Swiss-Prot record:
Main function: Essential for viral fusion with host endosomal membrane and core release. Not required for virus morphogenesis and egress. Induces complete autophagy through the interaction with and down-regulation of host PYCR2.
Protein name: Inner membrane protein E199L
Subcellular location: Virion membrane; Host membrane
Source organism, top-level taxon: Viruses
Gene Ontology terms: cellular component: host cell membrane; membrane; virion membrane
Record PTM: Contains intramolecular disulfide bonds.
Length: 199
């Protein structure tokens, strides 16, 4: 059974890994190196080479970059786009056939999972869609909601909007406090932004 992805955008939030994808016997025949990497992952013996063999949508290489596998159970850890998937995302940490990278293995073996995420072992609902999912992820775990902010600096357009908003707020504050002194008045925002374009 092929699992066609809804999106192939790097780090797009995806939670439905219910499609098991090609069977294990089919995976063994078609992708023996990938299956061997998954087996090593079962015993925490995966290597950096295994990480490359499995790959991801973001890597644009390896098993998990291929349409038929990208959103299968095997790729639930590397392609979910969720924070701390190895700690708190059931299709990843609750599935032995989901390949965990060497980094994810180290987080688990060194017990570096944030303690507040343990309540999310069984995710009842997952929030975030479209552009909003680029900003936050909601884990709704048995009526307890944890929101994790993603680094806005990874999104240049959102960063630009944030900078413009900050400049407008600063301008408003300065112009309202210095409004009584005509000599201290700031230029209008349109002039400020037109000067920014000259840089």
């Amino acid at each position: 059974m092929s699992c066609m992805p809804v999106s192939t955008k790097c780090n797009d939030i995806w939670v439905d890994f219910s499609c098991t994808g090609p069977s294990i016997s089919e995976l063994q025949k078609k992708e023996p190196k990938a299956w061997a990497a998954i087996l090593r992952s079962h015993t925490n013996q995966q290597t950096a080479e295994d990480d490359t063999i499995i790959g991801s949508i973001c890597d644009k290489q390896g098993l998990c970059s291929k349409d038929e596998y990208a959103y299968s159970q095997y790729c639930a850890c590397v392609n979910s786009g969720t924070l701390w998937a190895e700690c708190a995302f059931a299709p990843c940490n609750g599935n032995k056939n989901a390949y965990k990278t060497t980094e994810q293995r180290n987080i688990l073996t060194n017990k570096q999972c944030p303690s507040g995420l343990t309540i999310c072992q069984n995710i009842a609902e997952y929030g975030g869609s479209g552009n909003i999912s680029d900003l936050y992820q909601n884990f709704n775990c048995n009526s307890v909601i944890n929101t994790f902010l993603i680094n806005v600096m990874n999104h240049p357009f959102l960063t630009l909007i944030l900078i413009i908003l900050i400049l407008i707020i600063i301008y408003r504050l300065m112009s309202s406090s210095g409004g009584k002194h005509n000599d201290d008045k700031l230029p209008p925002p349109s002039l400020i932004f037109s000067n920014l374009n000259n840089f």
